[in-house]
Each structure stands twice: as structure tokens, then as C-alpha cells.
Amino acid sequence: MEISQQAGWCKKPASPMNTRAALEAVRNTAWTIVLLTSAAVMGASGISRVSANLGHSTVMTCPNRTNISMVTWKINPKTGHQCTLAYLIDKDSTGKNSCSDRINWRSRPDWDQALEIQQVGKADEGNYTCEVVNADGNFHYLYHLTVLVAPRMALYCDDHGNPVCEAETVKPAAEISWVPESNSTPRADSHGNGTVTVVSRFAARSTNGKNPTCIVSHATLNETRSINCSSRTLAQLPGGSAP
């Protein structure tokens, strides 16, 4: 059966018998068509959940396949538009559609098809798909990216001389504990911008002469600080300021 250029790429599912013919059609098609369309998937793996710290870089890799003819990265953020990177190996040609300059190949795509995001932001959260084409068909690998934000923390004395520890995060919420152990229950307040502030007020009956110590636990940071409210001495945790 004769395969037209349009049917060969846009509509015909890839199969071991027709893959070479489909790739021949791709070579004669504009890069905009390559970037905005998707071939059928012959093989797939599960979703890998990855996380990156806000403002840092992160890398996602493609599945290891031999005799690759084309590689495509498709980015579907929770907010904003889809963007696509593509590389046609036979022609040593790359294409890019709607992607930020921060999102690009980690190195030369002819020998490293990994995707790198520089200065990761909250808007980068979402699904990332690498599609690889070779003589056996099309294969893809899925990632779900979560962006972590380090807590903003403060340790201070309230108007009654009680130690108060605060930690503000986007997600997940930080955990706060005290030494000596306090019988107070931390309060978590959610805000419209997606952040969560956890507040804990030290309420132990006795400290045995020791300064209360606040312990903040989070995926991106673990900090321990002490404070002496009997003399109203202020101690701060890095990244925060007391009111």
C-alpha cells in the first residue's frame, strides 16, 4: 500500500514493517510538522517521579535504544503551553517549538539525548515525555517533575515569652518538633499562592534549665536552632527573619 507523506507521519501508526517508510516521509516534511505531531507508541515504561529544587538545574534522560533515527522531548507543564524539542539523527537537524531558553538538550543530541532544565521554576512542574524512534518502532519514557522549595524559617519569642518556630514551604509542608518535647500541636495555614506556613509554639512545663530547641524537617533542608526567651534573646533560622 502506498503511503503518502502526510499519512506516513501524521496518521499511520508506526510498525516494524512501515517504520523506515514513515521516516522517509519525515525527512521530506517541514520541522513544524515533526514538532507538532506524535507517532504511535510501540513500547513504553512507567512514569518516573522526579523532583528538583527551585532555582537549581535538573536532567532527565531518554531510554537506551540502538540505531536511533529520531528523538523528541514533549513537555506538558501544569500551567502554560506544551513545548517540544526534536532531533533527526540522519540529517543532524534539530527543531524547537515554544520552549524556554532554559529548557534544552544537555549536550550534543547526536550522542546525548538527555534534557536539561536550568534555573527550575514552579511553572516547570508537569509531565515530560521522551520519544525515541528506531527500526523496531517508537518508544517513550515518562517523567513527572515536582519542584521543591526550601522552607523560609524563623524562631522567635512571642509577647508572652514563649518560643515560636515557623516554617513556610510550597510543598510538602515542613515538620516541626521541639527538644524538650512540647505538648503543643503545630498549626498549618494554607495560602492562595500555594504555600503552607507551619507554626509551632513551645509549651513544655519545664526545660530543665536548657534552652528550647526547634527542629525543622523538610525534603530540602533539616535545621536545628535553640532560643532563650527568658532573656528575650532572639535566634533566627537561616533564610528567615523574625517579626
Curated annotation (Swiss-Prot):
Domain Ig-like V-type: 47-146
Any one biological process term the GO annotation gives: regulation of neuroinflammatory response
GO-annotated molecular function: signaling receptor activity
Residues annotated as domain Ig-like C2-type: 144-228
Keywords (A to Z) from UniProt: Disulfide bond, Glycoprotein, Immunoglobulin domain, Membrane, Receptor, Repeat, Signal-anchor, Transmembrane, Transmembrane helix
Gene3D superfamilies, A to Z: Immunoglobulins
Residue ranges that the UniProt entry lists as topological domain Lumenal: 48-243
Residues in compartment: Cytoplasmic: 1-29
Localization in the cell: Membrane
Disulfide bond is among the record's keywords: yes
One Pfam family cited in the UniProt record for this chain: V-set
Transmembrane regions: 30-47
Family: Belongs to the CD200R family.
Protein name: Cell surface glycoprotein CD200 receptor 1-B
Source organism (scientific name): Gallus gallus (Chicken)
